[in-house]
């Protein structure tokens, strides 16, 4: 669709109220979007959005796109990020192998940021073979991952690209 743009309000939501009390940040982000896309102003209006996940050795590299120079995490650990691995689940009645996917734990404090890439150190270690990463994909979430433009990262889900 033309002239349809998305903003992130994930950092101002409330668990039990669909109408967030803090409306100013949402209005500000809508205004940024209008300035950029309707009036052609050079403003940073796009929130970080996950575009790819690559396994490199035991690390996972999550690449973001958007109007920012770098990412930042508010706090010591990344919130609302889930990693999933596929594993063997047996065979079906025809003898065909089946797989299942389950969430795996990782150290949310063991990360590094290089520009617009979030690197989860050792997330793919210890027998884990991460197949998918999901961010802010629960019914309610509180994000703490932002772009240097001050906008919160958008929810995303990405399959992991081949291991290098």
Name each region found by the language model:
Residues 16, 28, 37-39, 140-141, ...:
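Sequence-level detector for tyrosine residue identity
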Residues 13-23:
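Active-site rim elements
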Residues 4, 50-53, 111:
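Generic structural motif
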Residues 6-8, 61, 119:
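Structured core elements
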Residues 21, 25-30, 128:
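Generic recognition of stable, solvent-exposed alpha-helical segments in well-folded globular domains
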Residues 25, 32, 36-80:
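Surface beta-strand/loop "capping" patches
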Residues 1-13, 28-37:
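Extracellular serine-dependent O-acyl
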Residues 67-164:
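C-terminal beta-sandwich/jelly-roll accessory domains of carbohydrate-active enzymes
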